[in-house]
Amino acid sequence: AASDVYKRQEFDYFKYAGNDARFNVPIDKTHQYYNPVLTGFYPDPSLCRVGDTYYLVNSSFTFFPGVPLSTSKDLVNWTPAGHVLDRTSQVPLKGQQVSAGIFAPAISYNKKNKTFYMITTNVGAGNFFVKSKDPSKGWSEPIYLKKIDGIDPSFFFDDNGKGYIVHNGPVVGGADYEGQRAIRCFEFDVKGDSIKGDFKEILRGGTHVEARPIWIEGPHLFKKGKFYYLMCAEGGTGGWHSEVILRAKNPMGPWEECPNNPILTQRTGLDPNRKDPVSSAGHADIVEDGKGNWWAVFLACRPYEEDMYNTGRDTYLLPVTWKNGWPEILAKNTPISTVGEKAGLKPAGKNEFSGNFSYVDNFDAADNGIGLKDLNQRWMFLRDFTDCYKVENGKLNMQLLPGNIYKREPMSAIWARQQHGTFSAETEINFTPRNDKEIAGLALLQKEDHNFVLGKTMKNGKLMITLTRAEKNNVTIASAPIKGGKLKLKVEGHDRYYDFYYAEEGGDWQLLAKGVDASNLSTQKSGGFIGACIGLYASSNKE
């Protein structure tokens, strides 16, 4: 009878479909691809190549497991490969707000000791790295680097085996203006897994310092020919975002600015009314394919109006061209196109990362991948993992924890990304609330105080379906009486406006609320850094 707490709420399936107009352009998948290559909340991409395989990581903030890892043979067709931080001991997240946690991971491979390194910042615990000889077999416990004051650390391993860490930090002597930051460089003792000596401030403020640049961050060091290159994001991860580059004969500088900076941006020189706009491009990483071709991955967004997007920051791919010893990711005043060209692509099976796609998760063995116990990798937990569910006989059974979506505490919910502006998500629940506080159903999350809950509950002892919208304050905007039995729930998104439906057992879909303003799920409204997530959610709401 002990497992009966898991029987309180049952989800039968989860169905998702994305249908954005911009991806309804037919392509030849042997030499064309859709941007973004990782759709939805996959920000701050970093990658490395080992042999013929590319390894890519993204930020995960307070979701667990942390730092999704994807692999590819061609940079376009990506396969989920687990998470770097899959044990709570590696990534303490307790009590952190949604957009804290893990910022901007960077992945590197040291050829000398044949070891992968992933270094990142946990806002609540400090800067650290983990390492692995074989990512498919897991990663080490965290090694914290207390000397790093700042965010966005990244490793560089030179041909001679020497190690370096670059990161964003405060300006030595204090900032002269808001947003002024610096890039620092440390030498790294590879054998001792520790930082050597003190840092050097290698870039102060950014490029074109006379223009008072802001938020220089996301630095990566790499080498080509006789030059070392320092590539950074600049302008902040919004509409003014960009990528800039400098070069030097030594990883500690002195640095020469590229005369063509920024080498990637969507901030100026573009028609604001252009079709299928892409915004906020920056935070890039760069890789060579082993045949002399260079490619960049970076984050950008698909706004539905001005600076609003619910899908978060996606991962894009573009070729890099070299001229006079400098790389360029995108020519000035060029809009990022939805379709990219790359020869020799090998699409295999179904791509649930790029373009329009749909999936049904039946919570059966076929769905269970490498991720949370007995669940497909698409599912994430928020903050420290709580053993609140069991997958049995093709059902997801969930107990009702007292925590809820509005608080920074453990709750019964698993989350998948909203990957399209035009989408639908549905589930069927089998749940009987015992009082007016208990609720279970579908949730849409951007932040603790920016979300929706579409759920089955009770009001004055009568069964109800309710829709609650949070934008700072929680407001129940629609409700309807329902009978007992199973209940289907569905949300259909149309960029800014969402429609919410329900269907009683054996009955047709009923519209509960139409054209609801869902801009509360945008970072523009909420502040923060994640893309909206769709949750299977249950709470007892006990005080």
Feature locations, PLM:
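Short beta-strand segments and strand-loop junctions that repeat across beta-rich extracellular domains
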Residues: 49, 69-74, 129-134, 246-250, ...
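Repetitive beta-architecture junctions, highlighting loop-to-beta-strand starts
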Residues: 65-67, 125-127, 181-183, 241-243, ...
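Hydrophobic core segments of beta-strands in well-ordered, beta-rich domains
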Residues: 37, 43, 48-63, 102-123, ...
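Extracellular glycan-recognition regions
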Residues: 7-26, 60, 326-327, 331-543
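Repeat-solenoid scaffold signature
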Residues: 268-318, 323
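Short, small-residue-biased leader/transition segments that mark boundaries at the very start
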Residues: 1-6
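Short loop/turn segments immediately following beta-strands, especially the blade-tip
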Residues: 70-75, 131-137, 186-195, 245-256, ...
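Surface loop/turn signatures of beta-propeller and other carbohydrate-active proteins
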Residues: 7-48, 76-108, 120, 138-157, ...
